[in-house]
Amino acid sequence: MLAVKNYKFWFCTGSQDLYGDECLANVAAHSKEIVAKLNESGKLPFEVVWKPTLITNELIRKTFNEANTDDECAGVIVWCHTFSPAKSWILGLKELRKPLLHLHTQYNEEIPYDSIDMDFMNENQAAHGDREWGHIVTRMGIERKVVVGHWSDPVVQEKQPWLLRLLPPPRPHPLSYQA
């Protein structure tokens, strides 16, 4: 009999404090909603765990080092909800030793053209933040899986079984019979 660990994947959202507390509260709420919906979909092999919004290089580095030492954390999923300066990620990315997935998505599936304003534009810059983040990761030569599309789309959710391929092989249970 094989023992399978109860792995978890951390969902880390990038932003910055430039946009203020209200925007950051919305970013956190949107991230929590995405995590809940991904877990409810039943399409992912393991639980996705929400982590507080990463807004500074110190917090990014601390979070990634915590992921490195957490035996249940099998990998990190990153999404940049707003513009998140790429230079803020460099130290954390250099030290990250877990598999990495870049979820390149937007919170809103549709752009509200009738009501769009600068607050909406500032809060929903994933297209900008994700591209800059992807650029720095590429420049650093860090391997990662990139999934592009709206997070609620079943096709996007089904692309995430890459998580299984990155896990270490299961070990036999110490009490199992081996012939």
Predicted regions and their residues:
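Metallocofactor- and cofactor-centric catalytic cores in central/energy metabolism, strongly enriched
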Residues: 1-179
